[in-house]
Amino acid sequence: MPSVAMLSVIAASGLMQFDVQSMGAASKLDAQNSLGLQAETGKIVANREVEERARRSGLQSMTADELERILAKNKGGHDAAVARQLSGFELKERLSNSRLQALIKSAPGPKSRLTLLVLADVSVFLAPAATEEPIQAPPDLGQQRHMIALTVDYLGKTLEKLPNFYAKRTTVRYEGDIQKVSPKGAEAQGAPLWRRVGSSEVTVLYRDGKELVDPRGWETRSAHPEVGGLVTKGTFGPILSAVIVDASHGEIAWDRWERGNAGTLAVFRYTVPESQSHYSVAAGFAEQAGGYHGDVAIDPATGAILRLTVKADPLLGSSTVRADIMVEYGPVEIGGKIYTCPIRSVSITRGATKMLFDAMGDSVPSEMVTRLNDVNFGDYHVFRSESRILTTDGPALNR
């Protein structure tokens, strides 16, 4: 069985999942050749953010500066009213963490602070504000090709050297209000008020290239702590190889320089057509492969992938209209050595919770809901054959 990265949600219409299957060594070599040629010919990838916004429900777009002015105008206002107002907005640029913390301090209460957190999470799929990007000339095609080759080499060598390890995965789940959909398919324009619907903490094992959730941490509970709502899996490696391999059969091109925590990052934008995609969306018992797009931010000196977004293209007839994931990677210490591993992830999905039949007998959504997960990874440890994972809810796990 190939390794799988999955983004799934339990909804009224059934299980909706988003799979990425990893490729073999031969495909990775093909990716190196194909990606290099694409960088050399300089293919241009169209901006897909307009398409993404078409999936949303009439929210008003604004910059971080405009958001700051709205909060200043509502200083001392009623917390619930400010939260409701903020829920009607979406950012048109990524909100930096430092900017977010400053905005949170000016929020009147917990409801508006929660809404700001969600607004920031939703914005992680966007580019930063132009004023926050480095002023630096784009690399020439030869430099682009070299960086892509470094990335393919990184995937082929570095990931294979990762030790078996385990880490703590902490997930906070958010959900917007259910919104009615008109018989003509137009979504209600009312802003969904976000709320926190739960959280979970599990131990994740990475062993022999596969991701496993330690069951001993939840076996005494009535249900798996991550069952229900939106669940993300497979961010430790397979998703990286699969996206790069798929992109080698699609299009990839230079996008921008970006400031990272440890220096300047090189960002490439990619698109994968449905015919070459190993990404699928399943609703109930029906599974449908579809195209996807996103961007990948790499260290230009080493090729290490430090940030990745995957955004599903709209699927005709699917009850899921959005299913996206972002993963950030950073240096972590495992067994006395430094490795690049996931440190944070944001997943978002929007889909139908209730379906009706129209006059033609086709099923159409009558209610829609948006769900979002904010995930943090930490407490990494090397996993040896004699390791014992101690949990608070069950006995130690031996391997």
What kind of region is each of these model predictions?
Residues 18, 23, 27-41, 352-368:
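Glycine- and small hydrophobic-rich membrane-insertion segments that are intrinsically disordered
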Residues 126-292, 300-306, 311-325, 330-399:
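Structured extracytoplasmic
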Residues 23-135:
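General marker for long, soluble alpha-helical cores
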Residues 18, 29-32, 46, 207, ...:
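Intrinsic-disorder/low-complexity regions
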Residues 1-24:
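Sec-dependent N-terminal signal peptides
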Residues 17, 21, 32, 38, ...:
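Residue-identity detector for glutamine
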